[in-house]
């Protein structure tokens, strides 16, 4: 505010100019989230900035050379959570624009975490963290992903990652995936994985191969930035294998009682 040549602009990423906007340079660092929404500039102290972003709040006193991450502000938005069967069990969560994290359920917040580096939570995927399914036979095998159906099978032990997003066949219309695409491991067989687009897809080998086991279970898509006419939830009966309920964002609920051979609209 006291220097007409000094300009800040933010969105993705955060930039600064010292020459009235003729040239810009990045001032974000590795501990600052890439998506920026607000910036406070101290009128009494040049270089003192407070930045609000998708990761929370960051503060700098030297015009972006170094940033402090303020972890005390609890602003994380979870899209989904799940747990495994370990003892003690782990909690998994997909966060809006902050990836997928996991950690022991019995961890207690400790102010020494930052000093010791012994933070109990671990990030296992980036992007917008979405739903999580864990193989109950081997908790190192985790299925999770980011927005619009970009899911992967993770081996937490080896660090290997395999993309498992279903693809349409040549000549077919592309599938429509919800922002928060649903996935489900069958409670009857942990090799069987379901994933919803506008169709219900089934894999019998943990996502290596897919088959469509339904027709389009929506009223059809609409043009726009975000897909519409998509499946949003999948549930299989824990008692009877092959009894599956599917809901979509246009208000339709379908059920199959024979593993996808026939479907009935019950909405």
Range-by-range predicted roles:
Residues 1-267:
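Beta-propeller blade termini and top-face loops
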């Amino acid at each position: 505010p006291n220097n007409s040549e000094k300009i800040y602009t933010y969105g993705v990423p955060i930039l600064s100019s010292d020459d009235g906007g003729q040239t810009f340079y990045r001032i974000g660092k590795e501990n600052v989230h890439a998506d920026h929404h607000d910036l406070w500039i101290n009128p009494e102290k040049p270089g003192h900035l407070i930045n609000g972003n998708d990761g929370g709040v960051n503060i700098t006193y030297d015009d972006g050379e170094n940033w402090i991450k303020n972890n005390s502000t609890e602003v994380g938005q979870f899209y989904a959570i799940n747990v495994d069967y370990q003892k003690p069990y782990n909690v998994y969560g997909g966060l809006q624009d902050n990836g997928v994290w996991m950690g022991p359920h019995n961890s207690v917040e400790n102010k020494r975490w930052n000093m010791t580096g012994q933070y109990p939570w671990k990030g296992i995927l980036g992007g917008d963290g979405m739903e999580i399914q864990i193989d109950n036979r081997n908790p190192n095998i985790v299925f999770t992903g980011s927005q619009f159906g970009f899911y992967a099978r993770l081996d937490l032990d080896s660090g290997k990652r395999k993309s498992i997003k279903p693809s349409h066949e040549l000549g077919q219309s592309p599938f429509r995936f919800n922002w928060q695409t649903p996935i489900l491991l069958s409670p009857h067989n942990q090799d069987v994985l379901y994933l919803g687009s506008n169709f219900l897809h089934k894999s019998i080998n943990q996502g290596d191969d897919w088959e469509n086991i339904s027709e389009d279970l929506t009223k059809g898509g609409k043009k726009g930035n975000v897909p519409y006419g998509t499946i949003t939830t999948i549930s299989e009966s824990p008692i009877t294998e092959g009894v599956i309920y599917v809901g979509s964002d246009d208000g339709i609920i379908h059920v199959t009682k024979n593993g996808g051979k026939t479907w009935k609209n019950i909405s």
